[in-house]
Amino acid sequence: MIPYMNLNEQVDADFTRARRRARLRAVMARIRREHAPNQLLSFDDVRREHAANNRLYRGTRVVGVEEIVGSVGRWRDFDRSFLPAKASVGQRWKRIDRAFQRGEELPPVELYKLEEAYFVVDGHHRVSVARYHDVPTLEAAVAEFHPKRLAGPAPATAKSRLAA
């Protein structure tokens, strides 16, 4: 935080920087002609690939922010680094950033786990603000999905899709 800025100015500046980083990452991806490398993974797509329908609630635990790689339903609103990809997320993002900077306790995010990857169900803005401020872990309520085991070659893992 810059000491001479009031909190509202700081929050506005944080969001502006986060959006600028997201736009720069998108431009660089286009220049490198990467195929959708800057998008979050869609949980529905990955779940379908793995035929993972068996869900088991695992409780609340601490999860590494870097392990959160995708979203349930909002994968277009944030980029691969959970930077805000759309200006429309700004008001909520700023509200979460303000609470973070005040040291307010925020509720756990809700995540789905598939193999070693996590997908946000609820808490996209909290994950985004945490990533922006280099917070290493978040408290999360986790439900785990297990893929059906089929004969034949295994589908690509969610983690392997990250490397693509």
Language model regions located:
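Short, charged/polar connector segments at secondary-structure boundaries
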Residues: 1-117, 121, 125-128, 132
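Glycine- and acidic-residue-rich phosphate-binding/metal-coordinating active-site segment common to enzymes
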Residues: 110-117, 121-164
